[in-house]
């Protein structure tokens, strides 16, 4: 069975192309100059969002002040709108890493090459491989700073919970770091609009948002929560690969212990 899983993983990685997920936490919020310097290679929608966010870079803001500058959706490298930004996480990089590790989430491999090597090592050690990479999506003009996955190893190719996280350019009113996140659950594999194999997501993305919260609460890592509804909430949309999804439009704010 493990040999079959490994072969399937190789096939999946081959058709999926480059699937990178940077795992390093940035040391500081990007400055307006840094954000603008990325504009030549930034997807169009992300570029517009980065400009509005850059104007507030480094400032302490209430969430009411943040929402107008917070992009509602992430984009693909080509600029196609994708997943909804449905989470804001308040805490240091150490708190984020500790909280999600305690809650059972793992960081996926960063590159296809890493995945192949890791899969071989796990197979030789008679262990299941669960760290398959996730694709790059963009927010604030850059790909995700890191990501987390949660899924049974035997099902992880087709089914898993996962989310991407970006450090925002601003701080909350108390001076704490704020992270924006987009979480969805993969429930199968399908061909996208270009004919490439990709994951199919659960259309009710609120389920994943609330599942992420539940895992953190079960681990005792949540200090407080609140839900925010933007003036222009995302109720229904289509991912960059053509999947439809729906939401109540609320963004969950999680304050970590």
Indicate residue ranges for each PLM-predicted region.
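Compositionally biased P/S/T/G-rich terminal and signal peptide-adjacent segments
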Residues: 43-78
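Bacterial N-terminal signal peptides
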Residues: 7-20
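Envelope-exposed proteins and targeting segments
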Residues: 83-85, 103, 161
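Signal peptide processing junction and immediate N-terminal pro/mature segment
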Residues: 18-35
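Positively charged n-region of N-terminal signal peptides that target proteins for export
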Residues: 1-4
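Terminal, regulation- and interaction-focused segments at domain boundaries
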Residues: 69-99
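A cross-kingdom signal targeting lumenal/periplasmic-facing segments of multi-pass membrane
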Residues: 111-257
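Primarily extracytoplasmic ectodomains and periplasmic/lumenal surface modules that are beta-strand-rich
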Residues: 92-109, 114
